[in-house]
Regions:
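N-terminal signal-anchor transmembrane alpha helix of single-pass membrane proteins
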Residues: 1-30
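Generic helix N-cap/helix-start motif at coil->alpha-helix transitions
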Residues: 21-31, 56-65, 93-102, 130-141, ...
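N-terminal topogenic membrane-targeting module
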Residues: 22-96, 111
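Alpha-helical repeat scaffolds
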Residues: 44-52, 77-89, 113-128, 150-165, ...
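A membrane-cytosol interface segment of integral membrane proteins
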Residues: 98-120
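Alpha-helical oligomerization segments
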Residues: 175-207
Length: 207
């Protein structure tokens, strides 16, 4: 009969093997989910995301966050809004909350949903630490431009664009806001100019 030391060694080996298995499956499952989203194979994506193994590998929030991203890619606005409502109603750690609120704000601003955008902007202005003030200011610019249809921030946006350097992500965002502000003034030429520049930087980011 095996002694306790042998049994303990066997248990440790089994635990390590199980840990390695789940670690590998977690990576491969996530990669597969990303591939299915990129290919827009939504039926297969839903089956994998709702499968028992995926439920064991990932917490509910992570799965629902992936589900939200899929609804955004599908442009299924009804289910995306339902998922935002569900996730925003959870008691989340600070960083998860910040990430989700900003994501929701960007979505609702894009949908020109004034009520929800305003509520989320109010919460964003209450964030503290790190780049909170800069993020809140940029979100205010987005709200003013896309919801209130203002154009009085053009000088500030042009200064920000001069100071941002070669960062394609920031340039893309600022150029897009400038395009919209010029559109709000009725300047079609400037709108097209900055929209084209924003598109070029967007392609550079996604290349």
């Amino acid at each position: 009969m095996p002694d306790s030391r042998t049994l303990w060694t066997a248990v440790v080996i089994i635990c390590i093997a199980v840990s390695v298995f789940f670690s590998v499956k977690k990576r491969t499952t996530f990669k597969r989910l990303q591939q299915l989203m990129a290919a827009k194979q939504w039926d297969e994506f839903d089956r994998l995301l709702d499968g028992k193994l995926t439920s064991m590998l990932y917490p509910r929030y992570n799965r629902d966050y992936l589900r939200l991203n899929s609804y955004l890619l599908r442009e299924d606005h009804e289910r995306a809004s339902e998922m935002f409502d569900l996730l925003l109603g959870l008691n989340l750690p600070k960083m998860q909350r910040v990430d989700l609120v900003i994501k929701a704000f960007n979505y609702y601003v894009g949908q020109e949903d004034r009520k929800k955008s305003k509520e989320l902007l109010h919460e964003i202005k209450g964030f503290e630490g790190g780049q909170a003030e800069a993020v809140a200011h940029e979100c205010q610019l987005m709200y003013d431009t896309m919801i209130l249809k203002r154009h009085n921030d053009i000088p500030e946006l042009e200064r920000m664009l001069e100071d941002v350097g070669d960062d394609p992500v920031k340039r893309c965002r600022l150029e897009y806001l400038l395009a919209l502000q010029y559109q709000n003034t009725g300047d079609e030429a400037k709108f097209q100019e900055f929209l084209e520049k924003s598109g070029q930087h967007s392609m550079a980011v996604n290349a």
